[in-house]
């Protein structure tokens, strides 16, 4: 059953990336990044649309060259979701994509160049009402900071971020968010905690270069979970060496587990043991695949026996408790007379879940359905 999170979020200012509000209590935006060649417009557009289909709020696109900037023009024309241009080294690329309707510019303080170049980007962003992300990364800190600190430290990442926050402040530009990413969980977490005390701007969270699908998901869940539980974070990206679509799914799963933002079904399922009366694992896997299209937030418990099944079903929108040949079915925590044949559980449960999703959706205001 859908419950509010007890987490009190950090107060922050509000910016907009396209039509997506960021900060000041807005839903935490989930984003990913394309891994296609940006000059391959067809492939990049296809990937952006795939990300949008699974719920991405924002997509970042790497724009490493002027050729990529020209391709970005056509990518933007063929997509609807807000796009962030990821800019490194050459500030002129930022100026070029600004002409093509980019929704946000990500610049890296470690390589974007001197203050005069940043000024050019800021003035362009101001003229076109484009927000900026100051994206600090432990792997690409400025040389003088590496000389000073010898290695990436929370203080080094903070100093890099604040150096550029100060530049934007002097230029009277407040439409920005900041990230201080690192591949080490503790380094990233402490960096964000320090930064959160220094500025009021929205924070974009991420554990950079987290790893493959399994290890990267775990590392991201631990690091981002620590920050989100403290109320820190306004947008996030799960960085995986995997299909970007998985980044969106994991991102929503993390938010869902903290009851910060729910999209789709929260499956509560036992790991199964010799007491199970039906194959829990295959049942859950099949239902997850079949029901990916449901965006309504709801809890479904699938428990293989009567030890924990009834208790979990009491706090679920739909609950299933394994029984001998026939399994018990619960709706809104109430045991129903109807029982499910263990040989046909998936089809029966899918029908009930879809019907229940429509009922739950009708109870939630339309503007809150994707919060």
From Swiss-Prot:
Names of required cofactors: [4Fe-4S] cluster
Family recorded in the similarity comment: Belongs to the IspG family.
Protein name: 4-hydroxy-3-methylbut-2-en-1-yl diphosphate synthase (flavodoxin)
GO biological process, one term: terpenoid biosynthetic process
Reactions the enzyme catalyzes: (2E)-4-hydroxy-3-methylbut-2-enyl diphosphate + oxidized [flavodoxin] + H2O + 2 H(+) = 2-C-methyl-D-erythritol 2,4-cyclic diphosphate + reduced [flavodoxin]
Binding site for [4Fe-4S] cluster: 270, 273, 305, 312
Pathway: Isoprenoid biosynthesis; isopentenyl diphosphate biosynthesis via DXP pathway; isopentenyl diphosphate from 1-deoxy-D-xylulose 5-phosphate: step 5/6
HAMAP family from the UniProt entry: IspG
GO MF annotations in UniProt: 4 iron, 4 sulfur cluster binding; 4-hydroxy-3-methylbut-2-en-1-yl diphosphate synthase activity (ferredoxin); 4-hydroxy-3-methylbut-2-enyl-diphosphate synthase activity (flavodoxin); iron ion binding
Highest taxon in the source lineage: Bacteria
UniProt-listed Enzyme Commission number(s): 1.17.7.3
Keyword annotations: 4Fe-4S, Iron, Iron-sulfur, Isoprene biosynthesis, Metal-binding, Oxidoreductase
Entry's cofactor comment: Binds 1 [4Fe-4S] cluster.
Xref: InterPro entries: Dihydropteroate_synth-like_sf (IPR011005), Enolase-like_C_sf (IPR036849), IspG_bac (IPR016425), IspG_bac-typ (IPR004588), NO2/SO3_Rdtase_4Fe4S_sf (IPR045854)
Biological role: Converts 2C-methyl-D-erythritol 2,4-cyclodiphosphate (ME-2,4cPP) into 1-hydroxy-2-methyl-2-(E)-butenyl 4-diphosphate.
């Amino acid at each position: 059953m859908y419950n509010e999170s007890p987490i009190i979020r950090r107060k922050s200012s509000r910016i907009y990336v396209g039509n997506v509000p960021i900060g000041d209590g807005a839903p935490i935006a989930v984003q990913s990044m394309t891994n296609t060649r940006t000059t391959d417009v067809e492939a990049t557009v296809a990937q952006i649309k795939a990300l949008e289909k699974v719920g991405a709020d924002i997509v970042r696109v790497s724009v490493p060259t002027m050729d990529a900037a020209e391709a970005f023009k056509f990518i933007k024309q063929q997509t609807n979701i807000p796009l962030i241009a990821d800019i490194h080294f050459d500030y002129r690329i930022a100026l070029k994509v600004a002409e093509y309707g980019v929704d946000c510019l990500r610049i890296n303080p470690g390589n974007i160049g001197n203050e005069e170049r940043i000024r050019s980007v800021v003035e362009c962003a101001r003229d076109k009402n484009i927000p900026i992300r100051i994206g600090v990364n432990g792997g690409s800190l400025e040389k003088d900071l590496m000389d000073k600190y010898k290695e990436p430290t929370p203080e080094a990442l903070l100093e890099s971020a604040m150096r550029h926050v100060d530049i934007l402040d002097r230029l009277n530009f407040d439409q920005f968010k900041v990230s201080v990413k690192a591949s080490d969980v503790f380094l990233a977490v402490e960096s964000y905690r320090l930064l959160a005390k220094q500025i009021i701007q929205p924070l974009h969270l991420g554990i950079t270069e987290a790893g493959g699908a399994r290890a990267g998901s775990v590392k991201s869940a631990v690091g981002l979970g620590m920050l989100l539980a403290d109320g820190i974070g306004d947008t996030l990206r799960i960085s995986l060496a995997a299909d970007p679509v998985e980044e969106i799914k994991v991102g929503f799963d993390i938010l869902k587990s903290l009851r910060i933002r729910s999209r789709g079904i929260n499956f509560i399922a036992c790991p199964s043991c010799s007491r199970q009366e039906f194959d829990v694992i295959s049942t859950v896997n099949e239902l997850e695949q079949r029901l990916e299209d449901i965006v309504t937030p709801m809890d479904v418990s699938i428990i293989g026996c009567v030890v924990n099944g009834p208790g979990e079903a009491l706090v679920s929108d739909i609950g299933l408790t394994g029984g001998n040949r026939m399994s018990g079915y619960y709706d809104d925590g109430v045991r129903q007379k109807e029982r499910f044949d263990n040989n046909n559980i998936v089809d029966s449960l899918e029908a009930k879940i879809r019907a229940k999703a429509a009922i739950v959706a009708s109870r939630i205001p339309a503007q809150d359905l994707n919060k």
